[in-house]
């Protein structure tokens, strides 16, 4: 469930039905996204080609912004997205768990849907580290060239492409070295 919650919900399933039990209280007027990642497979062990997203809201509308693009140089990439709260957060975002995570398709495409207006930072990482805070000393990652991605009401940002390098980088302020 995205954005990430302090306490993960409990899943109960029987047959074709899944029940999601929220241990945390939900924020008012917030759009939440239930993500089914590519690890889900059928009885023949065939995995999903792309992750699936379902949205619900605790308010009277579901947010409708989106950010999409391609991760280059990776067959197992994941896009990590942080909503930036303030100026200080714009340089320290990678030290906290991403607000949103989405596995890219085999061809590298990803799409975050149901996003609220605001400023976001995005990076690509191998999906084995998906959903984790970034440790620049231990993880390969790629940043988008824009310092932040501004999303307005009913706004779709396309072609937010990211190159995932072959060697480790270092985040220094907002510049990738």
Would you name each region that the model predicts?
Residues 50, 126-168:
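Structured interaction patches on ligand/partner-binding surfaces of diverse proteins
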Residues 1-114, 119-121, 137-143, 166, ...:
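Acidic, low-complexity Ser/Thr/Gly/Pro-rich repeat segments typical of extracellular/periplasmic
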Residues 170-172:
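Short, acidic, small-residue-rich periplasmic hinge/interaction motif at the N-terminus
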């Amino acid at each position: 469930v995205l954005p990430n919650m302090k306490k993960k919900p409990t899943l109960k399933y029987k047959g074709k039905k899944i029940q999601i039990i929220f241990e945390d209280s939900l924020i008012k007027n917030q759009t939440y996204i239930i993500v089914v990642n590519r690890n889900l497979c059928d009885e023949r062990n065939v995995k999903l080609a792309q992750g699936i997203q379902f949205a619900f809201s605790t308010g009277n509308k579901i947010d409708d912004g989106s950010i999409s693009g391609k991760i280059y140089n990776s067959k197992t990439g994941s896009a990590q997205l942080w909503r930036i709260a303030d100026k200080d957060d714009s340089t320290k975002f990678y030290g906290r768990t991403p607000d949103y995570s989405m596995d890219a398709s085999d061809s590298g495409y990803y799409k975050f849907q149901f996003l609220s207006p605001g400023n976001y930072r995005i990076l690509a990482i191998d999906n084995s580290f998906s959903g984790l805070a970034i440790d620049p000393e231990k993880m390969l990652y790629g940043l988008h060239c824009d310092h932040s991605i501004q999303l307005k009401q009913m706004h779709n940002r396309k072609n937010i492409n990211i190159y995932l390098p072959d060697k480790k980088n270092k985040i220094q302020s907002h510049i990738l070295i």
